[in-house]
Amino acid sequence: RQRQMCIRDRPSPWINDYGQFSIMPMTKQLKIDQDSRASWFSHKAEKATPYYYSVYLSEYNMTTEIAPTERCAYFRFTFPEASDAYVVVDAFDRGSYVKVIPEENKIVGYTTRNSGGVPQNFRNYFVIEFDKPFTFNKVWADYHLVEMHLELQSNHVGAAIGFSTKKG
């Protein structure tokens, strides 16, 4: 099952992954916990190369694509027609920060998640921009939505945004 699309500052065979955070699109019901939001997929409906990854998420009847660049990655989510399409950003534990900026269709933040071997002040910053306005936006801590806030810093935080989508 596909639980998320994980982004890393640097995968390393010597000190493991560090600076990782994840992005997961979904439809129907918002699910923040990575195990409950997981979707079935088939390797037959997956394409993986060093420069492109695509997978059909059968649980949500949608396709997710990622194309990495030297400094960032481009995502494309092909949703079905839905009034409840979401994207969850998980900045993981060990200290993280997120801020949703609805007027700019943007989420910014950082993660300090690592497996050791990095400086004490290590942070991997991210900026996520969307090409559609949000119809829903929340932040969460320890898998619980936090009301009345669009910015949060704690051990384990994330953001959830929603859209109304047309097919394709």
Give short role names for the model-derived ranges.
Residues 1-4, 8-167:
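Accessory carbohydrate-recognition regions in carbohydrate-active enzymes
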